[in-house]
C-alpha cells in the first residue's frame, strides 16, 4: 500500500508512527518531531508524526484532553511545514472531518469507536489513509468486517492497528497471533507497542502503564511480522499530560529502533512460513 510517499507491507521495511499522546505545546511538538525525524532519517525508517488535538476518551473529565481543534491543528500544520514529515491524528464522531483532513496526512480512528459503522465510513470518505485501531473488546478476526465497511466507502488505504485486549479489570494483554489473523484482512497491520502496556483506569482517575514492557512487546510484534509500529514517546514521560506511564522516553527511542530494524530485516528477509497453511 502507498502511504505518504512510501510503500508499506510485509515486503517492505518497518515504518514508524510516533509522537506524544496529545499536543501539549508547539515547541514540544517541533522538538519531538525534529528529533524523531533525524533518527528515523539516519536509520532509514519511514516516519509519520502522531499527536492528538483532543483526547475524548480520558478516564476523568478533569484530565487534560488537549488544546482543541483550532490550536491543535495549527501545531500539527507547523510540524508538517517546519519538520517536513507527514502527520496523523485522532478523529472522533463530532470532529469536523473535512477540516482535519485538509491539514493532516493520515486519519486515525480510536479503538472504542471501531464498531461505529457511520463513523468509520465517514472517516474513510475523507480521501486520506486511515489507521483503524482495533477495540480492546474485539476479536482480531472481527476486524475483517471493520475493514470491509471502510473499503465499501471507497477507500483502499486502510491500516489496522492492534493495541491489546482487555484481560480482567484495568489490564491489557497482547496476543501475537492476532497480528497474523489481522493480516487476513489484506490491510497493513500496525502494532501499538505503548497503549498495549497501558493499565486502563489503573490509577483511579487516570490510566497507569508499564513502559518497561514496551521493548518486550515491540520486539515480539516485529518478530511476528508487522508492517509498522505505533509508539507514543515523550522527552519526559513522567511529566507528560496524557498517557505518560506507558510512553517510551524519547532519549531511548533510537536504541530501541535499531534493535527493531535488525529484527525486521531478519524476519522479512526469510519470509513467513505460516503463510499458505
Swiss-Prot record:
Gene3D superfamilies to which the protein is assigned, alphabetical: Aldolase class I (3.20.20.70)
Annotated EC: 2.5.1.55
Enzyme class, first EC level, given as a word: transferase
Cellular component GO terms held in the UniProt record: cytoplasm
Coarse class of the protein's main subcellular location: cytoplasm
Example of a GO biological process term: keto-3-deoxy-D-manno-octulosonic acid biosynthetic process
Disulfide bond sites: none
Pathway(s) served: Carbohydrate biosynthesis; 3-deoxy-D-manno-octulosonate biosynthesis; 3-deoxy-D-manno-octulosonate from D-ribulose 5-phosphate: step 2/3; Bacterial outer membrane biogenesis; lipopolysaccharide biosynthesis
Subcellular localization: Cytoplasm
Keywords: Cytoplasm, Lipopolysaccharide biosynthesis, Transferase
A Gene Ontology molecular function term of the record: 3-deoxy-8-phosphooctulonate synthase activity
Keyword Cytoplasm: yes
Reactions the enzyme catalyzes: D-arabinose 5-phosphate + phosphoenolpyruvate + H2O = 3-deoxy-alpha-D-manno-2-octulosonate-8-phosphate + phosphate
Keyword Cell wall biogenesis/degradation included in the entry's annotation: no
NCBIfam families in the cross-refs: KDO8P_synth, PRK05198.1
Family of this protein: Belongs to the KdsA family.
Name of this chain's protein: 2-dehydro-3-deoxyphosphooctonate aldolase
Organism field: Alkalilimnicola ehrlichii (strain ATCC BAA-1101 / DSM 17681 / MLHE-1)
